[in-house]
């Protein structure tokens, strides 16, 4: 009787944190490029650096800067974040450090009386 060997290869997606960390690193190291208008498919780095190599296949590149969502931009229908209410203790996107874009914030303390319809 003969022996039989079976090999199976498969790819497994890394855990979510690993993927997120990799994407964040690629995002912060992305390169601004500009396309030539010659239908050649060629692109060049917008900030010409003689020592800069060509972009690699796994590198993130972008054609235009992202808008500054902190400031009002009527053309983009963006009201900005000035005057928005933030949550000083929140770890989320509504926290004051993130939402106020480093401009600082005012603290508003309120005391309210509300009917609670309590039953004793």
Curated annotation (Swiss-Prot):
Key words of the record: Developmental protein, Disulfide bond, Extracellular matrix, Glycoprotein, Lipoprotein, Secreted, Wnt signaling pathway
Assigned protein family: Belongs to the Wnt family.
Cell location: Secreted, Extracellular space, Extracellular matrix; Secreted
Lipid-acceptor residues (O-palmitoleoyl serine): 1
Disulfide cross-links: 86-101
The keyword Acetylation is assigned to this record: no
Post-translational modification comment from the UniProt entry: Palmitoleoylation is required for efficient binding to frizzled receptors. Depalmitoleoylation leads to Wnt signaling pathway inhibition.
Name of this protein: Protein Wnt-10a
Gene: WNT-10A
Biological processes per GO annotation: canonical Wnt signaling pathway; cell fate commitment; neuron differentiation
Gene3D superfamilies in the record: 3.30.2460.20
Chain segments annotated as transmembrane: none
Species of the source: Alopias vulpinus
Functional summary from the UniProt entry: Ligand for members of the frizzled family of seven transmembrane receptors. Required for normal tooth development. Regulates the expression of genes involved in tooth development.
Positions of glycan attachment: 29, 87
Example of a GO MF term: cytokine activity
GO cellular component, one term: extracellular space
């Amino acid at each position: 009787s003969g022996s039989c060997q079976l090999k199976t290869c498969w790819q497994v997606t890394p855990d979510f944190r690993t993927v997120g960390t990799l994407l964040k690193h690629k995002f912060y190291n992305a390169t601004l490029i500009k396309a030539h208008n010659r239908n050649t498919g060629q692109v060049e780095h917008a900030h010409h650096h003689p020592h800069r190599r060509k972009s690699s296949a796994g590198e993130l590149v972008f054609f235009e800067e992202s808008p500054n969502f902190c400031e009002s931009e009527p053309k983009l229908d963006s009201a900005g974040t000035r005057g928005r209410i933030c949550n000083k203790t929140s770890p989320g996107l509504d926290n004051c450090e993130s939402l106020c874009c480093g401009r600082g914030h005012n603290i508003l303390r309120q005391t309210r009386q509300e009917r609670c319809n309590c039953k004793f």
